[in-house]
Amino acid sequence: MTQKIKCALIGPGNIGTDLLAKLKRSPFLEPVWMVGIDPESDGLRRAAEMGLKVTAEGVDGLLPHVLADGVQIAFDATSAYVHAENSRKLNALGVMMIDLTPAAIGPFCVPPVNLKELVGRKEMNVNMVTCGGQATIPMVAAISRVQKVKYGEIVATISSKSAGPGTRKNIDEFTRTTSGAIEKVGGAEKGKAIIIINPAEPPLMMRDTVHCLTEGTPDQAKITESIHAMIKEVQKYVPGYRLVNGPVFDGNRVSVFLEVEGLGDYLPKYAGNLDIMTAAAARTAEMFAEEIISGVLKLEPVVA
């Protein structure tokens, strides 16, 4: 039996609950704590039924148990507003943070684009951008590694049912964080992000549109090849990630149309936005966990 790295999840909402299902299947990670603020929360109840320790007293309810229970990685699926404080408290105990909020106090992580580099830098807080960012930035990066992208714009459409209260509270942060990551990770000179929450019934599957303006005339063959290679990389951890149409070339504009089907771990398969976020976070934590298990990475307390 391989040694597993013990994890805590903060935020028992849609994202936290979906992530828990994925961590339960991980060969390297063992979820042991679920942290919430509402004792009546469905997510806390579910986690307790799965055998996790739970607290409804927020991160402060977890802190006294971190060292005794050997927690080394924590996932924050709460809100951008509280993440900095959560991270400070846990980093001080030597716990690495995987941030699933748009707080972005640590470097952005989009696994197929820059995960290996971040593991090598021994970061103690990495930010998973947003669901729209995880779905689209690999495509921007696939184009920008072929030639310079002057402008990258993404439109993420998610079903209303898949957007919980935390996601709704963080809409402005979603836009800012995703735009920044299109530039920093995707490689576009200027980035723009738009999110649409669609109330249609039955709920629609997550759809994403990516438009990039290249500096010169797009090299169609190379860009097409690069996009298909990148899609295969994303499909390694999100099998329901699909190219619906494209790349479509129109002058200097390259457009890619995607849909993301979820595994249906917590919400039904239309909520691919949960999957792309939680699967990317689990993939990231697994890479760090492998380094910890092999002795290459030693987590040290961070003094604030």
UniProtKB/Swiss-Prot annotation:
Keywords for the protein's UniProt record, in alphabetical order: Aromatic hydrocarbons catabolism, NAD, Oxidoreductase
Catalytic activity: acetaldehyde + NAD(+) + CoA = acetyl-CoA + NADH + H(+)
EC numbers, comma separated: 1.2.1.10
InterPro entries: Acetaldehyde_dehydrogenase, Acetylaldehyde_DH_C, NAD(P)-bd_dom_sf, Semialdehyde_DH_NAD-bd
Top-level division of the source organism's lineage: Bacteria
Coiled-coil segments on the chain, per record: none
Residues binding NAD(+): 162-170, 273
Residues forming the catalytic site: 131 (acyl-thioester intermediate)
Pfam families noted in UniProt: AcetDehyd-dimer
Biological process terms in GO annotation: catabolic process
Any one GO molecular-function label of the UniProt entry: acetaldehyde dehydrogenase (acetylating) activity
SMART domains given in the database record: Semialdhyde_dh
NCBIfam families named in the record: ac_ald_DH_ac (TIGR03215), PRK08300.1 (NF006157)
Family membership: Belongs to the acetaldehyde dehydrogenase family.
Protein name, UniProt field: Acetaldehyde dehydrogenase 1
Lineage of producing organism: Bacteria, Pseudomonadati, Pseudomonadota, Betaproteobacteria, Rhodocyclales
